[in-house]
Regions:
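N-terminal amphipathic/basic leader segments beginning at the initiator methionine
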Residues: 1-11
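A cross-family glycoside hydrolase active-site/sugar-binding cleft signature
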Residues: 22, 73, 102-106, 130
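Conserved glycine-rich "GG(E/T)P / GGGxP" loop and the immediately following alpha-helix
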Residues: 66-91, 133, 137-148
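Canonical Radical SAM [4Fe-4S] cluster-binding loop centered on the CxxxCxxC motif
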Residues: 11-52
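Canonical radical SAM enzyme core domain
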Residues: 43-58, 78-121
């Protein structure tokens, strides 16, 4: 899997201690729609892309007694959908682990219907939807247990 980084123990992006995977690509849809640079994660574009074996990454997660969920964010996980799906399949079917997997996406539900159909095949998948909109109010998301940056953003347990 290609990533821009990972955080072994993250306590900011989900209510449970998580391993945070920083996915490497994004179409910069927030910038395009706002006709200016608004991306909160644009600094990640300067980070080198690293390649890590899925099994190695999974074993790293399972060896940590603190974390109990995996959060996929960074730039845009759904712009690396094959890698994301392969990793989820490994966690669910090879390792037989049903810990929560949270996916932060800037896409709307309507834009990713096909991908959601694939993700719904796995248990305990939570998706945060919606692009960042500057000058919007933050709000607390009950499912994630943390604040989201724009009032159009929300999460949903899809399976």
């Amino acid at each position: 899997m290609k990533l821009r980084g990972l955080i072994d123990e993250d306590f900011l992006n989900y209510k449970k201690p998580s391993m945070f995977l920083i996915f490497p690509y994004c179409t910069l849809k927030c910038d395009i729609e706002n006709k200016m640079n608004v991306c909160q994660n644009s600094s990640l574009l300067k980070e080198p892309i690293i390649e890590i074996n899925d099994v190695t990454l999974a074993c790293r997660y399972f060896s940590n007694n603190i974390t109990s969920s995996i959060v996929c964010g960074g730039l845009e996980p759904l712009d690396s959908f094959d890698d994301l799906l392969n990793f989820i399949n490994l966690i669910r079917n090879e390792f037989r682990c049903n810990d929560d997997i949270v996916i932060y996406t800037g896409y709307t539900e309507n834009e990713i219907k096909k991908e959601l159909t694939e993700l719904e095949k796995y248990v305990n998948i939570i998706v945060k939807f919606g692009r960042f909109i500057p000058n919007n109010d933050q709000h607390f998301d009950e499912i994630l247990g943390c604040n989201l940056s724009s009032d159009n953003q929300y999460s949903k347990k899809i399976s």
